[in-house]
């Protein structure tokens, strides 16, 4: 579809990363594609004309700043995540895409020529993705795997350069700092509020609590109401087949509150730790 319209796209993560040796074999539940932000709407419209539908998303963009649009099709077993930016890369989307595009290459996959990130950029994408939840065993394992690969192939300088051109230095610091020579003298920038909140959101509800704490008093009441009584899109975004009858919604509200209350002690601990690190 993108080729027929002359729209620049490249595929991230997924089977291509496995073929490159950047990731251990795993089953992909969706397809991740990065599109030229200037032509995002054009690509989405073309997909909709071919039977793809936007997946419901939480309308609270303050808590969950959008970085992609997910579409699904009744005749396809997977979704497509159409990225127009990538969390951790703070450069303006259109400028960032140009830096990314010059670091892509073409491979043959499933009988098609596909554009994918070059090796260093592929590592950067995977590392940033894993750093969103670095305490999860699977993410920790992926970071260790990528670290060993980067050391073995001497990718640290290339990664440092890419992180600099995409303004990802602050986000990727925990991964990259261990790869650089101890003699390297470097001033690391501060991570954005969005990235700090994303990484700190370990427990159910923590992202909303953090967003409300950082919001202005003018919008706090509206955000609090949305957290207490979320719209149907919140449930459908997690499970597109969720029961939206009155009884079904009540069950989901009850389960949501139960998860939040169980996580409350850990949430308070994480908030205290975040406050201490910011002092």
Language model segments and positions:
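Conserved NTP-donor binding/palm subdomain of two-metal-ion nucleotidyltransferases/polymerases, i.e.
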Residues: 1-29, 35-279
């Amino acid at each position: 579809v993108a080729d027929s319209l002359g729209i620049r796209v490249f595929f991230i993560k997924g089977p291509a990363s496995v073929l490159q040796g950047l990731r251990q074999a795993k089953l992909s539940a969706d397809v991740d594609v990065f599109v030229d932000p200037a032509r995002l709407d054009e690509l989405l419209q073309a997909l909709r004309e071919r039977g793809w539908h936007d997946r419901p998303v939480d309308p609270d963009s303050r808590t969950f700043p959008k970085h992609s649009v997910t579409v699904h099709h009744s005749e396809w077993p997977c979704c497509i995540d159409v990225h127009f930016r990538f969390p951790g890369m703070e450069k303006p989307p259109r400028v960032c895409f140009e830096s990314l595009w010059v670091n892509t290459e073409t491979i043959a996959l499933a009988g098609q020529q596909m554009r994918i990130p070059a090796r260093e950029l592929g590592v950067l994408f995977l590392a940033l993705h894993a750093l969103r939840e670095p305490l999860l065993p699977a993410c920790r394992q992926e970071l260790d795997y990528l670290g060993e690969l980067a050391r073995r192939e001497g990718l640290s300088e290339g990664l440092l350069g890419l992180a600099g051109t995409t303004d990802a230095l602050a986000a990727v610091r925990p991964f990259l700092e261990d790869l650089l020579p101890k003699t390297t003298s470097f001033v690391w920038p501060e991570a954005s509020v969005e990235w700090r909140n994303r990484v700190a959101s370990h427990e159910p509800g923590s992202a909303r609590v953090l967003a409300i704490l950082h919001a202005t008093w003018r919008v706090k009441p509206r955000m609090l109401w949305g957290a207490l009584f979320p719209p149907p899109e919140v449930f459908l975004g997690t499970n597109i087949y969720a029961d939206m009858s009155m009884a079904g919604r009540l069950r989901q509200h009850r389960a949501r509150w139960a998860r939040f209350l169980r996580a409350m002690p850990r949430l308070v601990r994480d908030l205290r730790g975040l406050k201490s690190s910011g002092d």
